Amino acid sequence: WFRRKIGRLTGLWLVRPSHLRQNCRMSSSINKIAKAVTRTLSFLVLTASMATIARGDATASLAQALKAADAGDWTTALQAAQGAGPSGGDVILWQWLRDGQGKLGDYEAFLARHPDWPGLPLLKQKGEVAVARSTDPARVLAYFGADKPGTGKGSVAMVQALMAQGRSQEAEAEAYRGWTTLKFDAADESAMLALQGEVLKLAHEVRLDRILWDGGRRAEAERMLPRVSKDWQALALARMALRSDSASAVKLTSAVPKSMLGDPGLAYERYTYRMRADRYDDAAKLILQVSDSKPALGDPAAWAGRRADLVRILFRQGKAKDAYRVAAGHQLTEAEGADYADLEFLAGFVALRELNDPALAVKHFKHLKTAVGTPISLARADYWMGRALEAAGDKAGATAAFVRAAQYQTAYYGLLAAE
């Protein structure tokens, strides 16, 4: 078959040597060439076939490994991954480590081999359980490098390692950072307090406040109660009761000492409590009382979602002035991204449509534009800026804004601007 193919390619019809004429001096050479080419092509075809089979086997192994990994069957997944090739095997290993299954050496080896893979922050954080089992301070600190622990267990391990090396100030700083920002189970809390109990006495209220803002950490909050003052205990109980819509919420809120009534976290829980009860006028009154400054809000980003909800409700109810004040008083920065952009848009929209104040609207639409980067959002910002400038009588400015918006023809507002 190969001889016939080569014959067609070269313009020769190769036949068996025994049938060649005896006086054809080239027959022997041609036959040798044909045999050599036949052997070469046979080898190439065989190699390609084997590679195809190997790829097929690797793909099948990887599919089996991924299916087992999804089911949490890591024994089967790792065994199947052995036939998935180097890259396929590492994909399964990556998943295994991100599930917190490996030993410290497994994490160290993978991070050294793949320092630029996606999802490494989570992988490294999951490895903190393994780090905590190490008794080598240098190895523990080398694992974290310039990064800070992301778990309570990891923070305890770093504090222990720093103390073992005599780096007491760094140990105290990490203990405070971890205690006030991270989640701890009961065992890790006890371990951290055993290491840095005196230093952390001043941080208990900060930690409890953060736990209450986060929500969903009731067990941690309850463990913190004996470590804080009676006033803070009353405040924490009221905040937890309000968040859970407890029947005792009103009673516990009334029991909060006068000195604690201005707590931003308490104001936030009272606000969301009223929103869930559809008490929108009461909610508006409360949020406007605390929107004059960032400290009064405590955590402006936590308020943002419910704030935007209230703006839309007040707008539909025809309460434009209150809607604008709620939107504009967010106290967010551009760093908050989508929440900042949403509230700036709402403030601008209400100012333009209901307050008939196009200059005020332009200010908010400019703020909106500085906080966005996608074609849809940029087109929306420039379109509404154009509408506001148009209402203000600035035809040239409006045209320029519409032209900018019209650049984005895949966006709804880009198409509107083009009209």
Model-derived segments and spans:
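Short, low-complexity, intrinsically disordered N-terminal modules
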Residues: 17-18, 30
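Bacterial N-terminal signal peptides
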Residues: 40-49
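Bacterial N-terminal signal peptides that target proteins for export
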Residues: 28-41
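Generic short N-terminal amphipathic or hydrophobic helices
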Residues: 5, 29-32, 52
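Alpha-helical solenoid repeat scaffolds
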Residues: 22, 53-419
